[in-house]
């Protein structure tokens, strides 16, 4: 990555755990064809009943948020606290609402987390495949604010699951995993560019550094959503005045006041030392009422696996708008983002109805 020196840009801008990414010198990912999610649509209950589903969270009950650090699922507070919102929802009784207050630091809103299974027995390591789908809504204030110092707010972190024995009493013994793990695979509005991007790992591994962005070299440029059709979603488009990421560029952006759908597929390959080699990561995005579109297809790639002795496995998802580097000195409009219909599955998940 010589022409634009993105490695330097990422290192300078995003340094905290859970931040954006510094590009390593790992696998140069190509963009093999990847099928779109299955034809047809389904409501939340129908999607939850499909074969392979491991966990569904509708954010319809106070019990969904009741857990805390050391529990199987729950929420953690930041400058504000996640709450259920019965007035804005994709389905059911309520949704999960995050508030981004004025003059808030990086942890603007806290986080929600859940393991893939209640007994911690369903986790994924080498030669495995799983999917995570959620719906998300954004207020105009949240999308339109450029947050001073912010490296870009996150949407979801898919990372290491807790180990058997994790509870509030044992949480300091290494059995409970935080959002910042070697495995983490993250969807983020990197550099506040206005569209979803992805990166891997809070630590790095043999072939690449920490926060390794999924950016495909393209001549003297980079594809940031590398599965988009011509004229593509390019780094250079983010630096024009005005920006051309969305026209003529084909980046899939965020849209206010509608329930967008995001689905991530992770397919791990065989373990080689501290990596799962020949792995693939896929991201689909859909606007409300429209079919999913392929945004990112990344691989073959060496996903960080941590050392074999750590025995970390994918098994936990975090939902959060954490924004590394965000200045608490900035006065800005209060923003909001909502989540609903979280599904974790062994098989691809249909689009919402």
Per-segment meaning from a language model:
Residues 14-16:
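C-terminal motif of bacterial Sec signal peptides marking the signal peptidase cleavage site
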């Amino acid at each position: 990555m010589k022409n634009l020196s993105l490695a330097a840009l990422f290192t300078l801008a995003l340094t905290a755990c859970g931040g954006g990414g510094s590009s390593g010198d790992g696998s140069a990912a190509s963009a093999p064809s990847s099928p779109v999610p299955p034809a047809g649509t389904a409501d939340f209950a129908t999607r939850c009943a499909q074969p392979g589903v491991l966990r569904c969270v509708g954010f319809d009950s106070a019990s969904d948020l009741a857990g805390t650090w050391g529990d199987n699922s729950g929420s953690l507070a930041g400058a504000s606290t996640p709450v259920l919102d019965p007035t804005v929802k994709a389905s059911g009784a309520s949704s999960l609402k995050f508030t981004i207050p004025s003059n808030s630091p990086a942890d603007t809103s806290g986080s929600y987390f859940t393991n893939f299974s209640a007994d911690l027995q369903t986790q994924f390591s080498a030669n495995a495949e799983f999917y995570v789908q959620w719906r998300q809504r954004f207020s105009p204030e949240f999308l339109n604010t450029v947050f001073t110092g912010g490296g870009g707010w996150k949407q979801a972190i898919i990372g290491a699951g807790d180990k058997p024995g994790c509870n509030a009493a044992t949480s300091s013994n290494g059995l409970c995993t935080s959002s910042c793990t070697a495995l983490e695979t993250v969807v983020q509005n990197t550099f506040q560019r206005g569209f979803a991007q992805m990166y891997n790992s809070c630590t790095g591994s043999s072939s690449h550094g920490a926060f390794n962005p999924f950016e495909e070299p393209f001549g003297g440029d980079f594809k940031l959503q590398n599965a988009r059709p011509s004229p593509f979603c390019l780094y250079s488009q983010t630096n024009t005045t005005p920006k051309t990421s969305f026209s003529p560029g084909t980046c899939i952006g965020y849209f206010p006041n509608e329930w967008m759908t995001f689905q991530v597929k992770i397919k791990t390959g065989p373990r080689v030392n501290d990596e799962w080699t020949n792995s693939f990561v896929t991201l689909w995005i859909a606007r409300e009422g429209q079919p999913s579109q392929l945004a990112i297809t990344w691989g073959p790639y060496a996903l960080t696996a941590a050392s074999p002795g750590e025995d970390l496995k994918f098994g936990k998802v975090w939902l959060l708008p954490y924004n590394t580097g965000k200045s608490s000195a900035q006065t800005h409009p209060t923003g909001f983002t909502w989540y609903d219909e979280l599904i974790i599955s062994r098989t691809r998940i249909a689009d919402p109805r």
